[in-house]
């Protein structure tokens, strides 16, 4: 046993001083030693077994444990914790190898079973008799303490898949090109150094080692938690340590004075309004007041009213000093007129709530277009409704009939003029004889004062006894003498009503 420990120390020192060839594992892959009783009983058999195994491993490119000086190291009984975690494609081979290892340990050193477990095992860890061997492409991990204590060999990461002739990563963190990449979850994906330092492993909360996939899942879940924390606006520890800072949602709004040659800036609208009122409005003298606000539509337009300028500047400052006096209402207005229009709405709402328990929302706050539409519908409905009082009674009908008869007797519109012409009758009021011997007669037309008197020959007297003239050809100034309703200036509705009445009177006169 002492000789075996001495050889182990010599091999470790040689591995430190001389570089190892690719594919050969360092002494960090050694396992636990068996008890002295087993070593003495099977010393000779295991020496031959170790030499055969070492030759097979070196010829096959696999990383076997360092065996030298003819001294063999005993193989420890495998424990559940000493089995390295393999990739997903090597699960079946790992189960078979574990069964073979159990048989070899229980059989007391059978050469064939131990050789198969050393050469064909796909689990991590380089070994001779003392440690379990790594298959080609696997990463070895250190387990030796250097003082003969039993050290548990645990994997640092998942092995690469077995490839033909590819060496695993050695104890000096050398990764061969024949196998897949070996990832270490603890210290950057390499095995422990040859100095016997124990590789760091990621341990779960219950003490079990984490595989590569478990570690990656935990890392990805941590990253997702951080992303969700940042997106939701919560402060992360990194932010609290100064690596990040949360910005406040509220921003200070600056109110700048845009008056010509004024660079004042305020933090609130009332302060800006006081500044404009005291400096720019009240400071103007001479009876002429102008607004010098940049971009104003009445820029530099003179006015004689200072109160107008004060009200106008409220549109620039945004201040609304006129607040509603009704309790519970927070409305404010830029002008007193707006406040005066707002206050009655509170009382109208109270009255409407008494009349109707469910007032319409549109009536409480109607738009201008809605008001005009309702007004038109209301007026249309009012015109269509029948009138409650009708003053066209029998007495009125008799008076209209009398006036129609008198008008017809004087103008003969209905009897001779067919309803649209006036019939004039002539009478001789004078007679004269000219120098040529002709006799002239002066005719006077009835109804009077409509047509002027005219001189005609005596031979034309018979033809001019009557004269029919259309109403449209009568002079307007004299046509009103027939009846005041002719050419009377009145609204269109009353004119239409009058014409209907005239037609009705004429119809009655025919009866």
Curated annotation (Swiss-Prot):
Zinc finger (C2H2-type) residue numbers: 255-280, 294-316, 322-346
Function of the molecule: Acts as an accessory subunit for the core Polycomb repressive complex 2 (PRC2), which mediates histone H3K27 (H3K27me3) trimethylation on chromatin leading to transcriptional repression of the affected target gene. Plays a role in nucleosome localization of the PRC2 complex.
Alphabetized GO MF terms: DNA binding; transcription coregulator activity; zinc ion binding
Chain positions found as Phosphoserine: 18, 24, 135, 200, 204-205, 384
Stretches the record annotates as Important for nucleosome binding activity of the PRC2 complex: 489-511
Stretches with biased composition (Acidic residues): 36-50, 87-114
Location of region: Interaction with RBBP4: 203-288
Single Gene Ontology BP annotation: regulation of transcription by RNA polymerase II
Biased composition (Polar residues): 346-359
Keyword Kinase: no
Stated name of the protein: Zinc finger protein AEBP2
Subunit comment: Self-associates. Associates with the PRC2 complex, which consists of the core components EED, EZH1 or EZH2, SUZ12, and RBBP4, and various combinations of accessory subunits including AEBP2, JARID2, PHF19, MTF2 and EPOP. Found in a monomeric PRC2.2 (class 2) complex consisting of at least SUZ12, RBBP4, AEBP2 and JARID2. Within the PRC2 complex, interacts directly with SUZ12; competes with PHF19 for SUZ12 binding. Interacts with EED, EZH2, and RBBP4. May also interact with RBBP7.
Gene (name only): AEBP2
Compartmental location: Nucleus
Compositionally skewed regions (Basic and acidic residues) per UniProt: 146-157
Top-level taxon in the UniProt lineage: Eukaryota
Species this protein is from: Bos taurus (Bovine)
Cross-referenced InterPro entries: AEBP2/jing_C2H2-ZnF, Znf_C2H2_sf, Znf_C2H2_type
Region (Disordered): 1-223, 346-388
Biased composition (Basic residues): 371-386
